[in-house]
Amino acid sequence: MKMHIARESIVFLLNKHLQNTILTKKIEQECFLQADTPKKYLQYIKPFLINCMTKNITTDLVMKDSKRLEPYIILEMRDIIQMMFFRTLQKHIFFKKNTDLCTEYAQKIEASCYHYTYQQQEKTFLEEYSTRCGTINHIINCEKKSHQQQDNDALNKLISGELKPEQLVGMTFAELCPSAALKEKTEITLRSQQKVAEKTSQLYKCPNCKQRMCTYREVQTRALDEPSTIFCTCKKCGHEFIG
């Protein structure tokens, strides 16, 4: 009961200076959700009260906690991110037909990203948060050019219910996209096994000095069913060219 009264008083004080009821409630609620004790709640809300009274706070720069939430968290950004996830999911016909579920999933994905990045210490909160959201948005995009829609493992699992939206944030790339990860791993393995030993030959003529004293090596830079690329180096002038 005392906590409830304290929260109402803080909202009143903040709004008195901000003159923005929606923003005031967002700030107060965010501080309350992030704090697991009344002491931490007061610790988070204190900078706002001070900034409001000194008129240093604006509606664009709203939240600061010296180390864990630096420099500022733009609360409106969370709404923008949620809308980004919503629009990405809506590209799939399943979510076009299930708008409520699409909204729920977009909110849960964003919330999980927010709480996940809140725990990270190495980077600034905003940098880590926006990076993580961008990665997941790319992964669940069914219109990606990198693969066909049926190969989108993460999106298909979301639709089938096998994967919950809030689970995305804690998964590795290999877990989110096993097909793409396996393909990438296979390509790396094959290329690492290539024979790249240099050989000497007079078959290739240097376009620079016109001599036929070159070393060459074969590298599989394209698909496996296409011929290897021949990289040549002239022993006379050092010019490098493709044979």
Curated annotation (Swiss-Prot):
Zinc finger regions, TFIIS-type: 202-242
Protein biosynthesis listed as a keyword: no
PROSITE patterns: TFIIS_CENTRAL (PS51321), ZF_TFIIS_1 (PS00466), ZF_TFIIS_2 (PS51133)
Positions contributing to Zn(2+) binding: 206, 209, 234, 237
Any one GO molecular-function label of the UniProt entry: zinc ion binding
Keyword terms, alphabetized: Metal-binding, Transcription, Transcription regulation, Zinc, Zinc-finger
Any one of the GO BP annotations: DNA-templated transcription
Pfam families tied to this protein: Zn_ribbon_TFIIS
SUPFAM superfamilies: Zinc beta-ribbon
Residues in TFIIS central domain copies: 77-201
Function field: Putative initiation factor. Necessary for efficient transcription elongation past template-encoded arresting sites.
Family statement drawn from the similarity comment of this UniProt entry: Belongs to the TFS-II family.
The protein's name: Transcription factor TFIIS homolog
Lineage: Viruses, Varidnaviria, Bamfordvirae, Nucleocytoviricota, Pokkesviricetes
